[in-house]
Amino acid sequence: MDKGIILLAAGGTGGHLFPAEALAHELKATGYSVHLVTDSRAERFTGKFPADEIHVVPSATIGSKNPVKLARSVWKLWTGLRAARRLIARLKPRAVVGFGGYPTVPPLLAATGMGIPSIIHEQNAVMGRANKMLASRVKAVAGGFLPEGTGAFAAKTVATGNPVRPAVLKAAGVPYAPAAGDAPFHLVVFGGSQGAQFFSKAVPQAVCRLDDALRQRLKVTQQARPEDREGVIAVYEKLGVPAEVSPFFTDMAGRIASAQLLICRSGASTVSEISVIGRPAILVPYPYALDHDQAANAAALAAKGGARVIAQVELSAERLAGILADAMSNPDALAQMAAGARQTGKPDAARLLALLVEAIASGSTVAKFKETRS
């Protein structure tokens, strides 16, 4: 049964695309055709995206104070808006769903201007700039960590959680395995879809400072940027520590599930995925985010005992080595953290968001949806 087209708008980074991918799976399973509109930067993350068609429209970030660059950005957004209008007029989607970031601005502005039911999904605990710009225009605001009943858009906010991909739900079925005694200890290090240069320096330096007995137990999976990869590999090879180092892992959910401990950033998708899978984590929020959204995301998980949060400026190699040594020597404490993480997970977020999309596409309201949701 073909229920019509739902157009998803997501781009910029994998953090915006992954929840859109999860929603796409859910919508297609219930009979919708799903199209994705994105930007050129995000195309490398769309290989497994279950869209019937993928469309690329121009977009740009408005942040520069340079008048020439600002003019170029505005022109690119205007070009994207015109392209999005043509696309929507041709597809005639039943609804348009945006997942944040400036690549969603042209499609959502076009959709709301053309009277198409529209929704934005905010993954973080703090609403991003693009979503703030769009929130007053759309019918509903779905929140990964946003609470219901507070804020300027309380009446239209639904706390759906962040949808996670089928691979994450599958990985959630793998129970946590504490590494007691001399058992191998798998450390997984990643920094979001673009890697984290800080970890490429800090983690190998910390491993250098571990006792030989601990290093002999250690196996590392680490995401590193292409320019950092060879240097990271060289350190682990010198130490005799088995390590897989790559800019991007296609099977990240499975690697998270196999970990005894994670060291990672705290983007919304990352926090949502590790909580659904249920693994202990050292979270190091990205320190340069304008809205400090990663710190807020991390705090939500730490409040349930599912993670330890450390500011990057406070995480020296010596301190990280001590944290690793303590973690490797206390498997019961890590098991408790894993349980705390799992308690915060929302594995049904994709289903709930799909129900909201269907309700708004059918002409219902957020108030009616809240009365009937299950």
UniProtKB/Swiss-Prot annotation:
Major place of residence: membrane
GO cellular component terms given for this protein: plasma membrane
UniProt xrefs under Gene3D superfamilies: Glycogen Phosphorylase B
Alphabetically ordered keywords of this record: Cell cycle, Cell division, Cell inner membrane, Cell membrane, Cell shape, Cell wall biogenesis/degradation, Glycosyltransferase, Membrane, Peptidoglycan synthesis, Transferase
Membrane topology of this protein: Peripheral membrane protein
Localization in the cell: Cell inner membrane
Catalysed conversion reaction: di-trans,octa-cis-undecaprenyl diphospho-N-acetyl-alpha-D-muramoyl-L-alanyl-D-glutamyl-meso-2,6-diaminopimeloyl-D-alanyl-D-alanine + UDP-N-acetyl-alpha-D-glucosamine = di-trans,octa-cis-undecaprenyl diphospho-[N-acetyl-alpha-D-glucosaminyl-(1->4)]-N-acetyl-alpha-D-muramoyl-L-alanyl-D-glutamyl-meso-2,6-diaminopimeloyl-D-alanyl-D-alanine + UDP + H(+)
Domain of life: Bacteria
SUPFAM superfamilies: UDP-Glycosyltransferase/glycogen phosphorylase
Binding positions (UDP-N-acetyl-alpha-D-glucosamine): 13-15, 124, 165, 193, 294
Keyword set includes Glycosyltransferase: yes
UniProt xrefs under InterPro entries: GlcNAc_MurG, Glyco_trans_28_C, GlycoTrans_28_N
Pathways involved: Cell wall biogenesis; peptidoglycan biosynthesis
GO molecular function (one): undecaprenyldiphospho-muramoylpentapeptide beta-N-acetylglucosaminyltransferase activity
Enzyme Commission code: 2.4.1.227
Keyword Plastid: no
GO terms of biological process kind: carbohydrate metabolic process; cell division; cell wall organization; lipid glycosylation; peptidoglycan biosynthetic process; regulation of cell shape
Entry function: Cell wall formation. Catalyzes the transfer of a GlcNAc subunit on undecaprenyl-pyrophosphoryl-MurNAc-pentapeptide (lipid intermediate I) to form undecaprenyl-pyrophosphoryl-MurNAc-(pentapeptide)GlcNAc (lipid intermediate II).
Similarity comment: family membership: Belongs to the glycosyltransferase 28 family. MurG subfamily.
PANTHER family in the record: GLYCOSYLTRANSFERASE, UDP-N-ACETYLGLUCOSAMINE--N-ACETYLMURAMYL-(PENTAPEPTIDE) PYROPHOSPHORYL-UNDECAPRENOL N-ACETYLGLUCOSAMINE TRANSFERASE 1
Protein name in UniProt: UDP-N-acetylglucosamine--N-acetylmuramyl-(pentapeptide) pyrophosphoryl-undecaprenol N-acetylglucosamine transferase
Record organism: Rhizobium meliloti (strain 1021) (Ensifer meliloti)
